[in-house]
């Protein structure tokens, strides 16, 4: 479920558009424009043509371009800068709206600090890292921390949007609590883990607002490319001036500026920042908090996914699927014993056994009290559970691990049939878990527990395989069981009997081969691997150590979310690539629009290059400048929403991008510039 902070604002939302328009004007300040070298060149060109307009108004020059032409070009050049600013402001505005919603979650509370064996009430902002506070039912937790004593039900809907309460307890992987969440029951003692201003909510607000956003490596590389292209075209346009003078071509300063602006990659230059901001925004709407844009980008380049079996690939609860009686044992006898041994078992496995017996063998659950039964709980030492009956005659029914039940039967003087090992082996080979059932000295049979693979997960892995991403299942199961589940789920490889050290070693091995690795984790023992992975997604329900080690936090604590994180990263990279291709392809059409129009009068030989048949040199330049500005505003929705994600390999994606955005980037300007030329002629503006 999405959190309140993650609901996206519509692009046409007035509350978003009005501030964005104001911000786009504010961003005309040289300090803001200078952060984007491409748009700074456009800004400088706009300023230069503005000076030319004022100069022509004050002292008209006989050799100057028509004043109306210079004014129109100047206005559209300023619009180009404003549209680029508007794209960035809209992307930032969505983040500011989310930050506003997050700020509303902050509540000034009084904390019950535990110090020197007694409670004292202090304002929550006065708490420091290491302080301990007491929280009881109805209290708001005053700050981020770890439960060091007690267990409680906590409402985290203010942060995660999930209405169902969660359990937080000391000493495990569910000990982390977040400031602003509410204790619903019981009493806990919390050790504060963040100073004021460094809390989870503070970090969310800072990241959402973009205050902590840094350019990703791909953005830096793309900026270098765009700056290089801009310098090349700047030098080319500067050299045109002496060539034009030598050739006797009347080339105005306005035309040179217009040519430069149309040739440099203004489309991607104007949208680049908005694309990056929107990428982090899309991830946040999936309730995943990325600590940096670098992490989002790395997710798009991931080569290997390490996925925990439980909760990610399988449902996590083993379900009883069949009963296998031993020779000489009736199915009804095994079903009755399995049911009796499970009636007081509140685990998902125990409930599934009762349900299987009821639905398949039509045996209604019986009351243990009627048999004067005593429930025998499961322990790590015995590895079995069951019940002892008194009426109508004494019985000791047990179910549990096969080797534990075998030991129990033999201790009662019973014999173990050879068929037991064969049946257990078949279940293990199929990826299941066998539970043996005994009635005193008689071994009755086996219950087949199966870890159910999530629906649709295999198709999802097929999509990643098509993109060249390798999937590895991480499990504590034995190799035989792990291999069976891996086959059923469709993963490429598995790591059985996994330990934290084995996970870390696997990540380092993959990285040693030049691969980028992504994984999820929630426990303190996952922290080293999360820190080592290129993309480490920590669960919000996990420990503070895990959340600090990872570079993303999943507020929903859903391990499957890693797959969506990778898709968002891929979409971000695809959007960068496709719009860059489109922008550079645009320049080709604008080249054919402006250059022939400027020089065709002196050099008739280049007339065939005027493939658009534009009506006049002034109309050609003005049409290209108008198209150059309008295409930015038209592409803002695509920059914010992202290019549609398709699970294809790198070569297939490249071919598709070149065909759709490369060829399309050439054709669209030809059509657009010609249409604008016709319209300008129709209204008498050129």
From Swiss-Prot:
List of residues binding Mg(2+): 522, 526
Gene Ontology CC terms: plasma membrane
Region of interest called Disordered, as start-end residue ranges on this chain: 101-123
InterPro entries: ATPase_P-typ_cyto_dom_N, ATPase_P-typ_P_site, ATPase_P-typ_TM_dom_sf, ATPase_P-typ_transduc_dom_A_sf, HAD-like_sf, HAD_sf, P-type_ATPase_bsu_IA, P_typ_ATPase
PROSITE patterns: ATPASE_E1_E2
Family matches, as SUPFAM superfamilies: Calcium ATPase, transduction domain A, Calcium ATPase, transmembrane domain M, HAD-like
Compositional bias annotation for Basic and acidic residues: 107-123
Functional note: Part of the high-affinity ATP-driven potassium transport (or Kdp) system, which catalyzes the hydrolysis of ATP coupled with the electrogenic transport of potassium into the cytoplasm. This subunit is responsible for energy coupling to the transport system and for the release of the potassium ions to the cytoplasm.
Record protein name field: Potassium-transporting ATPase ATP-binding subunit
Organismal lineage: Bacteria, Pseudomonadati, Myxococcota, Myxococcia, Myxococcales
Name of the gene: kdpB
